[in-house]
Amino acid sequence: MAVQDRSVLVLYGSETGNAQDMAEELGRICQRLHFKSRVEELDVVDLNALLQPKFVIFVISTTGQGDMPHNSLLFWKRLLRKKLPPGCLASVNYTTFGLGDSTYLKFNWAARKLNRRLDQLGAATFIDPYEADEQFPDGLDGSFVRWTGRLYNHFLEHHPAPSGLEPIPDDVILPPKWSLETTIQNSTETNGHVPPSLENIPSSTLLPIPDGWTATLVGNGRLTPEKHWQDVRLISFDVPRRDGVKLACVPGDCLTIYPKNFPQDVQRLITLMEWEDIADKPLDLSQCESLPTNLFTDSKSTLRELLLNNIDFTAIPRRSFLKNMSYFSTNPDHKERLLEFTMAEYLDEYFDYATRSRRSILEVLEEFSSVKLPAERLFDIFPLIRGRDFSIANGGVHQSHPTDENKTRIELLVALVKYRTVLRKPREGLCSRYLDNIPMNSTLTVTRKPVLSPIHGAQNAQRPLVAIATGTGLAPIRALLHERLTQPSPGPMYLFFGNRNREADYFFQQEFDALVTEGQLNVFLAFSRDQRNKIYVQDRLLEEAKRIEEVIFDNGIFCVCGGSTKMADAAKKAVFEPFSEDVKDVEERKKMLASLTWWQEIW
């Protein structure tokens, strides 16, 4: 039983799901200490909600260039309101757990900004905030285990449960946060929906996603040669108007794709868990007391449909999932091994077993075959499928449909994720497999993720641009070039593009060659594997130091996109160091560099 004044609100801001998983685990830790815990994403709550619980714990990652996660922007906007008096949060006792990567320049800035603002408004920390680093030897998981251990001991020492209440042991399963028990019991039909054909193509069901757009797949062409190590696609969608409004995107925006599972994999899981008798019974989800945030499904569904469209059993299992497995194992050896993976002293073994090998949840369940998870706890145990963000690769007039003014044409430059690990079976990303296999003219629900950036618009188009990209980082750069070319008299544009091989990896070569011929674009290429001495974009930047200096003096824009923080850092060094040597006046140099527009999108 939870005592009324023992309440904890756990709030998370998450892009990839790590912060959410950790927030859910914190909620369970607090439950075991007899706190009444509530876990929510930041945008769901208003500021008054911070005043109600005894303690507030924030779990927040940093995205982009020190930005708040997408699902915390509304909360952050509320927190920044100027009319808030300095002591309005004086009764709030809080702490933060920040997730970051020290290879990024603005390490853990989201957590730092949040701490600073909460302090300004009078809130006080009840335990020191923590900044986890992806680069630690034991990664974010190790940091989380150590910090939650300190939090647990702090609560035990300073806020013990009332006399007679001992912490709930780890080997006792907690009540489910979300349960399908009622709706499964109330489904009296024995042969509800007819199972879909086991033709191995993802479901064509349009998901009811808030603010979603219906997109039709109209192009899915491979840009790299068939024998090339990487399969890079130019994927095109047509998006019709929604409620009379046309989809409008600007450079830097992303299109979010929501992948689905494959029918044969779903059947494997149903058979493995012995869910055949209930897999196709109609379920009324409106009978559930609560449902997870970001569960995109109709109220009438089936277990099979939920597995096809919503449940991510291809994800790498987190330690909390393995702990849940242990509760339902009938094999003592299996149970012991699963519990070992959740212990701090066995973090290395968990990393080797799950993370390094990229084992999926389905594969782990097949290996620990004694585990039979109850369907009633589906939402409580399994993660949900998350949308994947892809930078939009076209802009300006190139987003106009060639024949239908009511549609927007969106293009994505996508490198399909296929690789091998220590396991023999090749690994393939869920979204990559989905995009590789959905038929042409399929419809799906997508969303637009706006990215705030200081690089686009008519006024910025007049300024010179230095665009630096590697690999598929060319996507947002191309969108920006498209937009600038629709503006009258755009400023000079310099593209520095790097990849492995000119013949295989020079995306949009014909398009850029034409712009060079027309005098609208200057291109500097760095293909690292085409000669004995490797050449990178930073080398080309150094070769053009005088030109770069002119752009700096002319209030230019610098844009860096790609999949490597090392590349971004090297590019920045190549831009700044020659300039610093040439401009001897220290104050002038500092002033110019401080006012420089530098935007980067690194993933």
Swiss-Prot record:
Report residues binding FAD: R358, R388, D389, F390, S391, G429, L430, C431, S432, W603
Cofactor dependence is on: FAD; FMN
GO biological process terms held by the UniProt record: iron-sulfur cluster assembly
> Where do the coiled-coil regions begin and end?
none
The UniProt entry, under InterPro entries, shows: CysJ-like_FAD-binding, FAD-bd_FR_type, Flavdoxin-like, Flavodoxin/NO_synth, Flavoprot_Pyr_Nucl_cyt_Rdtase, Flavoprotein-like_sf, FNR_nucleotide-bd, NADPH_Cyt_P450_Rdtase_alpha
GO molecular function terms attached to this record: flavin adenine dinucleotide binding; FMN binding; NADP binding; NADPH-hemoprotein reductase activity
Q: Which domain of life is it from?
A: Eukaryota
Task: Quote the Pfam families the UniProt record gives.
Answer: FAD_binding_1, Flavodoxin_1, NAD_binding_1
Q: Which residues bind NADP(+)?
A: T472, S528, R529, K534, I535, Y536, V537, Q538
Main EC class the enzyme belongs to: oxidoreductase
Keyword vocabulary terms for this entry: Cytoplasm, FAD, Flavoprotein, FMN, Mitochondrion, NADP, Oxidoreductase
List each copy of the Flavodoxin-like domain by range: 8-152
* GO CC, one annotated term: mitochondrion
Q: Where in the cell is it found?
A: Cytoplasm; Mitochondrion
The signal sequence is: none
According to its UniProt record, where is this protein mainly located?
A: cytoplasm
Which residues belong to any copy of the FAD-binding FR-type domain? 210-457
Identify the residues that bind FMN.
Answer: 14-19, 61-64, 99-108, 134
Q: Which reaction does it catalyse?
A: 2 oxidized [2Fe-2S]-[protein] + NADPH = 2 reduced [2Fe-2S]-[protein] + NADP(+) + H(+)
Enzyme Commission number(s): 1.18.1.-
Stated family: Belongs to the NADPH-dependent diflavin oxidoreductase NDOR1 family.
- Function according to Swiss-Prot or TrEMBL: NADPH-dependent reductase which is a central component of the cytosolic iron-sulfur (Fe-S) protein assembly (CIA) machinery. Transfers electrons from NADPH via its FAD and FMN prosthetic groups to the [2Fe-2S] cluster of DRE2, another key component of the CIA machinery. In turn, this reduced cluster provides electrons for assembly of cytosolic iron-sulfur cluster proteins. Positively controls H(2)O(2)-induced cell death.
Q: What is said about its interaction partners and assembly?
A: Interacts with DRE2; as part of the cytosolic iron-sulfur (Fe-S) protein assembly (CIA) machinery.
In Swiss-Prot or TrEMBL terms, this protein is called NADPH-dependent diflavin oxidoreductase 1
